[in-house]
Amino acid sequence: RGIHVDPYMLRLVRRIKGDARIILISDAYASDGPIPPGYDGVTDINFDYTGEIAGSKLTLDVACRNMMKHTGASIVNAFQYAALNPARALEMTDRGEIAVGKRADLVITDHKMNIQTVILKGETLP
């Protein structure tokens, strides 16, 4: 269950906005602030040294998995939300989809969205 957006809200947004208008984002932020009382066991939020929420540890693969789990989105939809839709929104026409002339930035996953390989500008990352 998400902290930022309730699964019921995810389903509503998908139904109202449609797949072409959903963009997944991630702070993927690391912090070493102390965990304030009442948040014991919460593993996906970072806190600053004042005890305020400083960001999320959520990564895009987990965001994609959450959308698939909570909304019934397909793996194709999940990649659309994480790559194609953001590229279009930012008018980055050289990326976001696999096509001739596009940048070869690829994330290869298994059917459960576990990352297997990352290719950046045509080069496989270690």
Language model regions located:
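His/Asp/Glu-enriched, well-ordered alpha-helical/loop segment
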Residues: 9, 14-109
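Short, Lys/Arg- and Gly-enriched loop/turn segments at beta-strand edges
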Residues: 113-119
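Active-site beta-loop-alpha junctions enriched in small/polar residues
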Residues: 1-2, 29
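Secondary-structure boundary/capping motif
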Residues: 5-6
